[in-house]
Structure formats: C-alpha cells, structure tokens
C-alpha cells in the first residue's frame, strides 16, 4: 500500500513537473489574412522553440483584435490599420508599435467587368463606377483593417454605399472572397489573401497600383501599465523576433506559387525599451 501511494505521489509530481516545463502561453490577436495565408505557421515555431512557449493565435479583424487588447484579453496584436494603431497607442492601450511588413490591396471583379474598371490605377474612380452602375460589391463589413481601408476609399469618393448592390459579409477575408465569387461581384482584398486563393476563384484582378492601396502591418504589445497581468517581456521578445533580420528574411521569402506575399519593413532598428509611463 505504501509503495502504491509513493508511486501515485511520484506520478503526480512528475505530471506537475511536465506541465510546468511546458512554458508560458503568449496570446496574439491578429488579422485573418496573416493566419489564413499560413504566414504565422511559417514564422512563429522558431520563436516558440527558442523561448519554450506556446503562442495562442486569435484570428479576427483588426478592429476586433484591438477591442480584445483594450480589454486586456491578449498580450500583443499584429494588425494592419495604421491610423487606428497610432490612436490605440496614443490612448494608452499599447506601447512600442513597430513596423513588420507590408503588401497592398487590390480590387477583384467578374471576368466581364460590367463596371468597366479593369486596368485603372485609381481606386476611388473604380468605386465611383461600381456605385454608379449599382454593380454588386461585397464588403468585409467587420471593422477589419480591410474594411477600414474600404470605408476610407468610399469617403474619398464622396459616397456612402447602400442598397441591394452593396453586401456586407461580416466574415474573414477568405470567406468574403468566396461570397464575392459566388455573387459574381467586386471585392477589395489584400494581395496575399488573393494570391493564396487565386486558383479557387473565378474573379479576376481588375484594379491595382494606386498608392492609397498600400497596406502596412504593425505589431503592438498591450500596455503593462493599463493591464499589469499581460506578458510584456515575452511580447517584446516576439517584437524582437518578427523585426529581426532572420525573421524579416523569412517574411520576405514566403511565397505562393513563386510570388511573394509580404514585403519586410522593419529595418535594422532594435525594439525600444518600455516607453515612459503615460
């Protein structure tokens, strides 16, 4: 009986030891595009191995990611809405935002291109033609970085899209693409998600190259001043990793069918120390 009890105790201690050695879990809220294109599966495992931790990825739109971060329910965010990111930091919710990478947005449309926008480099004019012809347009409609950019373009075009022709998916980018494809409509999408799904779509690329379609991504640790429980040191270690020359090269060489999905943009600057308390 004593030997049996000793065995049970030892097994329990071993179990606790194994559980404790599993390391910390870092909570990362990020865009559906970085998740759906497989980029995170490409760049995160080396960090997890080096730091003996697990990164729990929450894939949502940028607006939702920021809301989760404001609530203190994640440790760090990787998002793509620069103005909103800067406001997020200015309001004390995040610290030490760093550039990570960029690509651009493009507009896809039906092969027949009923709006007649194929080849134009003016995104504002393209949306004006779509609206004037009441051609089907599918929006993310979810306050994501893509949706924020789309709303910016409608504002630039002096239009408020509404009516049966304007559909809101309220879903991630890949799901929105599928909906637009089914409806044979127009849609705005980040280039990486388009390239990742291109072979499954009937829609064709019709608008690209407008500077306003630039799409930068940034990483922001949640403020430990606002939420003392967050894993700030591990978050900053992740910032250091994704902006390091090694990871930046991994980002820059990540391809789909020979085409680069993202362009690194961190440069060689080291991550900053914790900003002064606001």
Residues covered by each model-derived region:
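Positively charged n-region of N-terminal signal peptides that target proteins for export
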Residues: 1-4
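Short, conserved active-site loops that position catalytic residues or coordinate cofactors/metal ions
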Residues: 72, 103-104
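Acidic, polar ligand-binding/catalytic clefts
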Residues: 76-102
């Amino acid at each position: 009986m004593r030997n049996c009890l000793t065995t049970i105790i030892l097994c329990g201690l071993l179990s606790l030891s194994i559980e404790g050695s599993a390391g910390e879990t870092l909570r990362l809220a990020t865009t559906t595009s970085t998740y759906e294109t497989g980029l995170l599966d490409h760049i995160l495992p080396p960090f997890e191995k080096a730091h003996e931790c697990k990164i729990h990825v929450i894939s949502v739109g940028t607006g939702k990611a920021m809301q989760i971060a404001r609530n203190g329910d994640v440790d760090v965010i990787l998002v793509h809405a620069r103005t909103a990111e800067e406001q997020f930091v200015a309001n004390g919710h995040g610290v030490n935002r760093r550039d990570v990478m960029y690509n651009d947005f493009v507009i896809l449309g039906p092969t027949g291109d009923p709006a007649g926008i194929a080849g134009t480099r003016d995104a504002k004019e393209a949306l004006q033609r779509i609206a004037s012809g009441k051609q089907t347009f599918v929006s993310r409609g979810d306050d994501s970085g893509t949706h924020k950019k789309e709303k910016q373009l409608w504002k630039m075009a002096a239009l408020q899209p509404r009516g049966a022709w304007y559909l809101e998916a309220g879903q991630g980018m890949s799901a929105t693409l599928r909906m637009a494809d089914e409806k044979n409509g127009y849609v705005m999408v980040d280039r990486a998600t388009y390239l990742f799904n291109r072979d499954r779509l009937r829609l064709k690329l019709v608008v690209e190259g407008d500077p306003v379609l630039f799409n930068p991504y940034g990483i922001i640790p949640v403020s430990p001043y606002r939420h003392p429980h967050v894993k700030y040191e591990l978050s900053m270690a992740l910032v250091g990793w994704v902006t390091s020359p090694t990871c930046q090269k991994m980002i820059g060489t990540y391809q789909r069918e020979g085409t680069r999905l993202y362009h690194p943009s961190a440069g060689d600057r080291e991550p900053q120390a914790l900003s002064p308390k606001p």
